[in-house]
């Protein structure tokens, strides 16, 4: 199965176009006012129309209520909801029942103990996203450019679809994929020149590096034994 490459926190037509031209599989849009990447619904509608089926559209929300989710879905028409807050298993089940969209649940990782929540979330979410656990004084749950110890994921039970986030860059994505065998990689701050400011060159570099990482892992795996 091919590695999924997701560029998150896009907010301008120009950087979205670069991302689509570069061949990203998913494009992420943030709906969380404290984030420098936050979109209003008008801009979300505009950017969503620009995608035109060239990549999967992902709406990132944080503990959003049904009214907020409904407005986002109407504007963006996302293919996937990314829940990046403290949503419970019961809340995820409720969102799926109400809106009928696939869900990716973010889980913050700092220690092996943080993986205790995985079985419950994996039972209801379509995939999980492992991100670095935010510092206690953080105002946002993600997009902070902080990696975690990828070795914590080395012994995951097989069959759980997951993506990796947290401090990824063009320079470390190969090691991240090799260590975790993640099914996808998700980057935001790692392709920015300043918080919320995407850099076209960095986006292209990351996508190319992720594709190379996929090839390297496939070749390494084929040579084992």
Curated annotation (Swiss-Prot):
CDD domains: PRAI. NCBIfam families: PRK01222.1-1. SUPFAM superfamilies: Ribulose-phoshate binding barrel. PANTHER family: N-(5'-PHOSPHORIBOSYL)ANTHRANILATE ISOMERASE. Keywords: Amino-acid biosynthesis, Aromatic amino acid biosynthesis, Isomerase, Tryptophan biosynthesis. Pathway: Amino-acid biosynthesis; L-tryptophan biosynthesis; L-tryptophan from chorismate: step 3/5. The lineage of its organism: Bacteria, Pseudomonadati, Pseudomonadota, Alphaproteobacteria, Hyphomicrobiales. One of its GO terms (biological process) is L-tryptophan biosynthetic process. The gene is trpF. Gene3D superfamilies: Aldolase class I (3.20.20.70). It catalyses: N-(5-phospho-beta-D-ribosyl)anthranilate = 1-(2-carboxyphenylamino)-1-deoxy-D-ribulose 5-phosphate. Signal peptide: none annotated. It comes from the Bacteria. Belongs to the TrpF family. It comes from Nitrobacter hamburgensis (strain DSM 10229 / NCIMB 13809 / X14). Its EC number is 5.3.1.24. The keyword Ribosomal protein does not apply. This is N-(5'-phosphoribosyl)anthranilate isomerase. InterPro entries: Aldolase_TIM, PRAI_dom, RibuloseP-bd_barrel, TrpF_fam. GO terms for molecular function: phosphoribosylanthranilate isomerase activity.
